[in-house]
Amino acid sequence: MNHCQLPVVIDNGSGMIKAGVAGCREPQFIYPNIIGRAKGQSRAAQGGLELCVGDQAQDWRSSLFISYPVERGLITSWEDMEIMWKHIYDYNLKLKPCDGPVLITEPALNPLANRQQITEMFFEHLGVPAFYMSIQAVLALFAAGFTTGLVLNSGAGVTQSVPIFEGYCLPHGVQQLDLAGLDLTNYLMVLMKNHGIMLLSASDRKIVEDIKESFCYVAMNYEEEMAKKPDCLEKVYQLPDGKVIQLHDQLFSCPEALFSPCHMNLEAPGIDKICFSSIMKCDTGLRNSFFSNIILAGGSTSFPGLDKRLVKDIAKVAPANTAVQVIAPPERKISVWMGGSILASLSAFQDMWITAAEFKEVGPNIVHQRCF
């Protein structure tokens, strides 16, 4: 299939959107998947934009109404999502959608209606000549060099454990936890507030995210870590105004919520339990392959110590003499996009694209027949 330009790959996350041209090692553009609209006429009167996206919306968020087109992994505002996709083509990539195919990512268990609407929008609204949709966890697995394994994918909006056999997601084994990076940032704000550190405004959020990403870690044993003297745990952080704050048990209490969601008053199993549950829902002959190939993906799996703690907690409940291995690829923040870049570049993949002619003939239902 010949086109004027290389395929575009878009990883549509709840927190960040990643976009670039297939064949590249990294996405050319990564920014917040948010849209800001002016409050009243103040910015418009000053010559500012009435609508802005990504980093620009983030920088102005205190004076804007902020909306998230994707929540908990699913598109909730189709109008805003279309604005975002058009922005990627027009202002970031500076490409015409009609000149080449696009590969878009989706979470496991994406509702059928959502899949159809995404397909429809790319063909009818953006006018792409060819399209494909691929599950995020499958792409992360490809990027790690595997075709079979259990992917624990935790980004900004949702955490999923997804068993994959020979490149195909096993939907009956997928488990989901509605707790991820955005929730952990909110939780860290609360933990710091409880220690008298008030970083609660919209503009403070970026600071709290930086603290989370720079200093938070997962304890091998939460109770033992809590028993340590505060001096042994202390980290200092300098705020933009020069003030220095001291941080202690908040740094491991925050990501502990991934293992014990009850800390955030959420009645749900933690990541160790959803991984175990996913594996046990699969055929007995596949379980050892999954226990020994647990692949981490997404920014919220990047906390130091998370991989070792996951091995420890899963090994406790796994059948006797079962090898448990967790693989933590260093590039896991972008591994979903990387997998899409690899897949869309393969010569063997070129016959997989849904063409505009096929869409016209079959309709949006074609996505269920071709993308799974």
UniProtKB/Swiss-Prot annotation:
The keyword Calcium does not apply. Belongs to the actin family. InterPro entries: Actin, Actin/actin-like_CS, ATPase_NBD. It comes from Homo sapiens. It comes from the Eukaryota. Keywords: Cytoplasm, Cytoskeleton, Nucleus. Interacts with PFN3. It is found in: Cytoplasm, Cytoskeleton; Cytoplasm; Nucleus. This is Actin-related protein T3. Disulfide bonds: none annotated. Its main location: cytoplasm. Signal peptide: none annotated. One of its GO terms (cellular component) is actin cytoskeleton. CDD domains: ASKHA_NBD_actin_Arp-T1-3. Ubiquitously expressed.
